[in-house]
């Protein structure tokens, strides 16, 4: 298990996450992870998902939906506290409880675009961990190409239905995190198939309604404790009050929220890098070769020194992005740089650490092996590296 005191010495909390209030909150999160997550994570990996009870426990401790206003049960604090939850889970290699998807991706859609009735219905339960949220964007034939999605939400006037006006949903989503557990899905669907991206709308779907189906739990290279699933919609009917925001504004809403999503991925990436360097350093100090610790070999020392330097640089850039986000000035291009650069660096650092572990680095009983496998998808979800670079290129060239 990672010695957190050692990690805090080499990678201490930095501004804007280093106030006494932040340190006190970090201690609470760390205690929760050490006592109620880490001892059970291997079993959750075998099960393919995290039990609902851990969500409720996180809710009891006030670790979910921290930025949700107090009138809906949240703490009403800023995003910096959410960043601490992401860091502590990632540092521990606890990639199963994907709280940030629920708290910092799904909940903000409702806070920002939801009606008062929608907020009252969904947010208190999400804060308590009784309602688990997910987001449905990706389809078998539409990943980065949101405009190409085929899931339809056809408007019905309700003249012949006792349920009144609403939408009838048909289609399929894939690679949906929290797919097996979710009670609420922020669904992106076409309400006007003739308008491309301008025909996309967001709807709040209660997954207990008739017509909603969960496919198999997908077997992944990594993230074994995260439930990732296919979802199906067959004549699923929701009321008109399920529309989130305005019809045809879904693509714009998704784009407005993506900078925070990409920053979350970058936060997890850098925290994982920091732990990987510590794990590798400790291994090199203990592992003997040719009568001396591997840490005495200059080539080995220099390779880990480079990984440490890369990690320090990533942290400095990430902290700058976090400060910008808290000030409301983090632009889309900078968030895209943070996402692709930090995740590319994460995989490079972790790959180097696996190499320095030798054969042990390929054994899943070692956290470095699991972290390496978990890291690979970071360059894919939340926007691929290639799409991130295209966003940056458009800013550079104006097109």
Q: How does the language model describe each region?
A:
Residues 2-92, 96, 113-118, 125-130, ...:
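Alpha-helical interface subdomain recognition
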Residues 77-79, 145-147, 178-182, 196-199, ...:
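Short glycine/proline-enriched turns and hinge-like loops at secondary-structure junctions
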Residues 99, 126, 141-144, 175-178, ...:
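Short Gly/Pro-enriched turn/cap motifs at secondary-structure boundaries
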Residues 104-113:
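Helix-loop "lid/cap" segments that line or gate small-molecule binding pockets
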Residues 129-137:
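A short, Trp-centered hydrophobic/proline-enriched beta-strand micro-motif
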Residues 148, 210-239:
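Flexible, small-/acidic-enriched active-site or ligand-binding loops
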Residues 150, 166, 170-214:
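A short core secondary-structure module
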Residues 231-253:
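Long, acidic (Asp/Glu-rich), low-complexity accessory segments flanking structured domains
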């Amino acid at each position: 298990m990672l010695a957190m005191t050692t990690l805090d010495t080499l990678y201490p909390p930095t501004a804007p996450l280093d106030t006494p209030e932040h340190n006190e909150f970090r201690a609470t999160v760390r205690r929760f992870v050490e006592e109620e997550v880490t001892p059970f994570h291997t079993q959750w990996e075998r099960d393919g998902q995290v039990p609902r009870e851990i969500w409720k426990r996180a809710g009891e401790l006030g670790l979910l939906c921290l930025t949700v206003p107090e009138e809906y049960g949240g703490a009403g604090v800023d995003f910096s506290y959410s960043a601490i939850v992401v860091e502590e889970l990632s540092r521990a290699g606890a990639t199963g409880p994907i709280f940030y998807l629920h708290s910092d991706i799904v909940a903000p859609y409702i806070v920002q675009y939801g009606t008062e009735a929608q907020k009252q219905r969904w947010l208190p339960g999400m804060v308590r961990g009784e309602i688990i949220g997910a987001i449905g964007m990706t389809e078998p034939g539409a990943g980065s190409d949101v405009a190409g999605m085929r899931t339809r939400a056809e408007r019905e006037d309700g003249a012949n239905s006792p349920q009144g006006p609403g939408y009838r949903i048909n289609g399929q989503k894939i690679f949906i995190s929290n797919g097996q557990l979710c009670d609420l899905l922020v669904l992106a669907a076409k309400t006007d198939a003739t308008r491309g991206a301008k025909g996309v709308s967001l709807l709040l779907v209660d997954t207990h309604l008739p017509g909603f189906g969960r496919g198999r739990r997908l077997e992944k290279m990594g993230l074994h404790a995260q439930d990732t699933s296919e979802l199906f919609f067959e004549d699923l009917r929701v009321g008109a009050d399920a529309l989130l925001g305005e019809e045809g504004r879904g693509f714009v809403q998704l784009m407005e929220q993506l900078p925070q999503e990409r920053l979350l991925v970058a936060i997890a990436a850098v925290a994982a890098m920091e732990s990987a360097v510590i794990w590798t350093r400790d291994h090199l100090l203990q592992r003997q070769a040719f009568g001396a610790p591997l840490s005495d070999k200059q080539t080995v020392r220099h390779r880990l020194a480079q990984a440490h330097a890369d990690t320090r640089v990533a942290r400095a850039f990430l902290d700058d992005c976090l400060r910008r986000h808290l000030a409301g000035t983090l632009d889309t291009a900078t968030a895209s740089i943070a996402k692709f650069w930090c995740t590319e660096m994460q995989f490079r650092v972790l790959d180097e650490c696996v190499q320095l572990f030798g054969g042990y680095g390929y054994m899943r009983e070692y956290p470095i092996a699991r972290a390496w496998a978990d890291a690979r998808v970071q360059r894919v979800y939340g926007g691929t590296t290639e799409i991130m670079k295209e966003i940056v290129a458009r800013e550079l060239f104006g097109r």
